[in-house]
């Protein structure tokens, strides 16, 4: 996939990622693109911000960035989220994201 898709865009060095989160799943993984969002499953429950904290920690490993480089831009209380990931060093294949040219 070349260029930008509906589930992400680049703003300089920042990756803006539109996600659909499935908390309290049986495992952690990137399911794939569903419509204009990237579906992500995590085991953390959606209680007291635990799912958001876990999501940031887990994504920091996937994109190989410090946790502080990932921000929830929209959707802090919902399953549909927009994330900002500053200067990702790795793009997981299952996320279907390309580095900008």
Swiss-Prot record:
Name of this protein: UPF0235 protein CJA_0091
HAMAP family attached to this UniProt entry: UPF0235
Domain of life: Bacteria
GO CC entries: cytoplasm
Similarity comment: Belongs to the UPF0235 family.
InterPro entries: DUF167, YggU-like_sf
Species the sequence originates in: Cellvibrio japonicus (strain Ueda107) (Pseudomonas fluorescens subsp. cellulosa)
